[in-house]
């Protein structure tokens, strides 16, 4: 029996009311007429995925500002500490888990590449290779599950979020980030927006559709934010620059450092992000959901 090559129902609500999105044919995007979820209708083959990710470079740059943001998140997570276990799904080489471990958390992670798994294992982390498998953990073992920029890469979101539910204790928290399909940049650039691309990104979320996904999987919303407007993304999407999105010299990173040193710029950033979140049009979708 051959594997299917296309989805015929919505990945979130299972409706068959799917419409191909004009202008996004190269990414095979369709939109659900029932819930509005946008996703890649084409199912990439194993070979397509291997060919893509074999050439997927690893970027080891870690901004000191990112470390600061990680610790601000961990400050928020303190009130959830009960089992003292935290899992980062798609943990890379463990930068977030480094900070969690320093604060006394028992840290766990999942990652696909042998290299990243070895690096994390050498740090003493509890790492499993491959996709999240709840069979690798005790039921309701974790206080916190995090996942930074991972959900857009998968085409089985109901299964993934259901797995979050099974390994989190009651009242435990999921914190997750993913690109926002309703961002100002996507509206401006449309299919030129380089966040959109097959077979790397297969699912595209908005505040509405990610809330639907988590609410239907046994979670309740604590917070949803959409923040940021990336000058780096704008320039690279338009072919005006080839700078790495995450790098010390990128326009975005230089701006982050200027903002950190200037109280007025910090106030301006906060005000802009408030407006972007209010209207749901920031680049990054950040969610906090508790297990019912």
Give the predicted meaning of each segment.
Residues 11-18, 208-226, 265:
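A SAM-dependent methyltransferase catalytic signature shared across enzymes that methylate proteins
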Residues 148-155, 177, 200:
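Short catalytic micro-motifs in class I SAM-dependent methyltransferases
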Residues 155-159, 186:
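Short N-terminal helix/helix-N-cap motif within the alpha/beta-hydrolase-1
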């Amino acid at each position: 029996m051959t594997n299917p090559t296309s989805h015929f129902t919505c990945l979130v609500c299972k409706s068959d009311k799917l419409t191909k999105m004009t202008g996004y044919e190269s990414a095979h995007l369709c939109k659900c007429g029932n819930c509005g979820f946008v996703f890649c209708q084409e199912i990439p083959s194993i070979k397509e995925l291997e060919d893509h990710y074999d050439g997927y470079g690893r970027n080891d740059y870690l901004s000191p500002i990112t470390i600061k943001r990680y610790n601000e998140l961990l400050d928020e997570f303190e009130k959830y500490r009960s089992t003292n276990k935290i899992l980062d799904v798609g943990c890379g080489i463990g930068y977030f888990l480094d900070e969690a471990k320093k604060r006394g958390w028992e840290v766990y992670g999942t990652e696909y590449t042998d290299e990243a798994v070895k690096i994390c294992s050498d740090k003493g982390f509890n790492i499993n290779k491959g996709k999240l498998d709840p069979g690798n953990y005790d039921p309701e073992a974790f206080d916190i599950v995090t996942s930074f920029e991972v959900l857009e890469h998968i085409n089985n979101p109901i299964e993934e979020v259901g797995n979050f539910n099974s390994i989190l204790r009651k009242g435990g928290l999921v914190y997750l980030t993913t690109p926002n399909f309703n961002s100002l940049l996507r509206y401006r650039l449309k299919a030129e927006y380089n966040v959109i691309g097959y077979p790397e990104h297969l699912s595209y979320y908005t505040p509405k559709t990610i809330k639907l996904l988590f609410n239907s999987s046994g979670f309740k919303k604590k917070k949803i934010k959409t923040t940021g407007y990336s000058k780096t993304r704008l320039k690279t999407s338009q072919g005006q620059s080839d700078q790495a999105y995450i790098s010390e010299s990128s326009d975005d990173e230089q701006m982050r450092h200027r903002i950190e040193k200037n109280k007025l710029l910090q106030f301006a950033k906060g005000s802009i992000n408030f407006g972007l979140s209010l209207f749901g049009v920031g680049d990054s979708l950040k969610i906090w959901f508790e297990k019912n």
